[in-house]
UniProtKB/Swiss-Prot annotation:
This is Leucine-rich repeat-containing protein 2. It holds the Pfam family LRR_8. Gene3D superfamilies: Ribonuclease Inhibitor. InterPro entries: Leu-rich_rpt, Leu-rich_rpt_4, Leu-rich_rpt_typical-subtyp, LRR_dom_sf, LRR_domain-containing. LRR repeats lie at residues 122-143, 145-166, 168-189, 191-214, 215-235, 238-260, 261-283, 284-305, 308-329. Keywords: Leucine-rich repeat, Repeat. PROSITE patterns: LRR. The keyword Repeat applies. GO terms for biological process: intracellular signal transduction.
């Protein structure tokens, strides 16, 4: 006996499938609307916009008002046109005069500095980033007019002692490299004002000789392996900004109030259980960012709304990422994550500065997904 075929009215079957199709289309429409309204989509849009503005050198204050970002394309075009107009109105020889004293290098095809550089000892500023350069040559001591050494995101594993010969150096940025130590001779750069050693991951201490740097106002040693605030940092009497986040701190020194000029103190992503009462003596402190996961004791006056201090306690809830088998890949992934975290916090802190008050609490959630 063959298969028994039951024939229904075809119009009934068609109506059934048309209903299913309509429901599916309605679901698709709702899903599109949900994604458009999704916070993740909004975050993605805003961060892409912020990245584009930063790439074009547009100040945050222009596109961020009261904590909200205007992501309209018209605004971006308008800002870009105004920027180009201002640039075109500048004297034509201004850029040429400045570039004659500036050296710039970027790109992974660079594994060492060009030989011709040693002949250009008149240079005052170096901007070298995203290269595979591992060594800064000793002939750097010849650049006596050097003011700025901006060397982030390379593969520098060693700084020569000769860097101490740069008596006019004001800014040193060696963030997100592979440094495990800083030469004591850097303490001879008595005019240094900014020091950024963030994101080297393996850096554990700073030499005591850096105590001589009395003009330093900015120190960033975040994303390393410091177990305590370096003694030399406590002796930088003009320090205004200290970022020691993402390290291994479990406590702060009782004499932290030596930093009388300190205005911004970033301590989040450590394992601090308490804050010393000497923190109350930092009369100029206006921003304090900590991780509240382990914090159980702190001076209540720090949270007093009548003070100008903005106290931010982050609750960090990381989602474990899948571990790579290759140790180098793990290290690179950690370096990239730390860099991204810093960019997020930088934008958040810039926004905080424009607010009259901070949220009563903030939860920072780390996650990894494809947007």
């Amino acid at each position: 006996m063959g298969h028994k075929v039951v024939v229904f009215d075809i119009s009934v079957i068609r109506a059934l499938w048309e209903t299913r199709v309509k429901k599916h289309k309605a679901w698709q429409k709702k899903e599109v609307e949900r994604l458009e309204k999704s916070a993740l989509e909004k975050i993605k849009e805003e961060w892409n916009f912020v990245a584009e503005c930063r790439r074009k050198g547009i100040p945050q204050a222009v596109y961020c008002k009261n904590g909200f970002i205007d992501t309209s394309v018209r605004l971006l075009d308008k800002i870009e046109r105004n920027t180009l107009t201002r640039q075109s109105s500048l004297p034509k020889d201004r850029g040429k005069r400045s570039s004659a004293f500036v050296f710039e290098l970027s790109g992974e095809h660079w594994t060492e500095l060009p030989d011709s550089l040693k002949e250009q000892t008149h240079l005052r500023e170096w901007y070298i980033s995203n290269t595979l350069i591992q060594i800064i040559p000793t002939y750097i001591q010849l650049f006596q007019a050097m003011r700025i050494l901006d060397l982030p995101k390379n593969q520098i594993s060693h700084l020569p002692a000769e860097i101490g010969c740069l008596k006019n150096l004001k800014e040193l940025n060696v963030g997100f490299n592979y440094l495990k130590s800083i030469p004591p001779e850097l303490g001879d750069c008595e005019n240094l004002e900014r020091l950024d050693c963030s994101g080297n991951l393996e850096l554990m201490e700073l030499p005591f000789e850096l105590s001589n740097l009395k003009q330093v106002t900015f120190v960033d040693i975040s994303a390393n392996k410091f177990s305590s605030v370096p003694i030399c940092v406590l002796r930088m009497s003009n320090l205004q900004w200290l970022d020691i986040s993402s390290n291994n701190l479990t406590d702060l020194p009782q004499d932290i109030d030596r930093l009388e000029e300190l205005q911004s103190f970033l301590l989040y992503k450590n394992k601090l259980t308490y804050l010393p009462y000497s923190m109350l003596n930092l009369k100029k402190l206006t921003l304090l960012v900590v991780s509240g996961d382990h914090l159980v004791e702190l001076p209540t006056a720090l949270c007093d709304s009548s003070t100008p201090l903005k106290f931010v306690s982050l609750m960090d809830n990381p989602i474990d990422n899948a571990q790579c088998e290759d140790g180098n890949e793990i290290m690179e992934s950690e370096r990239d994550r730390q860099h991204f975290d810093k960019e997020v916090m930088k934008a958040y802190i810039e926004d905080l500065k424009e607010r009259e008050s901070v949220p009563s609490y903030t939860t920072k959630v780390s996650f990894s997904l494809q947007l």
